[in-house]
Curated annotation (Swiss-Prot):
PANTHER family, per database record: AND PUTATIVE PEPTIDOGLYCAN-BINDING DOMAIN-CONTAINING PROTEIN 2-RELATED, LYSM AND PUTATIVE PEPTIDOGLYCAN-BINDING DOMAIN-CONTAINING PROTEIN
Region (Disordered): 186-207
Domain LysM: 61-105
Disulfide bond residue pairs: none
Coiled-coil residue windows: none
Protein name, as recorded: LysM and putative peptidoglycan-binding domain-containing protein 2
Matching InterPro entries: LYSM1-4, LysM_dom, LysM_dom_sf
Biased composition (Basic and acidic residues): 188-199
Entry-linked SMART domains: LysM
Domain of life: Eukaryota
Amino acid sequence: MADLSPVLQPHREGGSRYGYTMFPGLECESEAELSLSLARTKTRSYGSTASVAAPLSERYIEHRLSPSDTLQGIALKYGVTMEQIKRANKLFSTDCIFLRKSLNIPVISKKGSLFNGLGSLDSPENETQDNCNSPTKEPALAEAHTVSIPSSAKTNQPIVRSDEELSAKDFLQRLDLQIKRSTQAAQRLKEEDLRHDDSYATCSYQH
């Protein structure tokens, strides 16, 4: 006689032979852990949508767009590539620039050029700022390297020297003065000894 009993499915781990779970709390906990792990994982992005962390030597300049602007012209103006502008602004194509009012232009500072071998990509605005700041730096350098000019007897103006020159001159003058005083004192002692010896010799000769 054939066995007409229903075929039982193999039971899962932690479940009974009839297909239902013996411990429903464990299954809920495993599902919660799975959802948390999926939430923690970051979605990958490729191409221009990838968020690349800017290095310490990179900064951005805001460029106001005009109807005649093109991506190639902006890249040539600031000395950067089109891909860098696309990556910085997350652009998919060159036509997307007309949907924006401004673009962020990545600019590499001079500090970064020492490490990666690339030239400085400063914009013309920064060049004008550097030119404006340079006249203020030149007088400071000139003051640091001023040559000592002797004061005239008529004007009695103080001698202009830098701090380093003044301290070195003072030190050398003091050293020369101390040497001169010590040599003079040694000569005086020597002369006094000679006089004392002469007086003692004359006194002994008279007696």
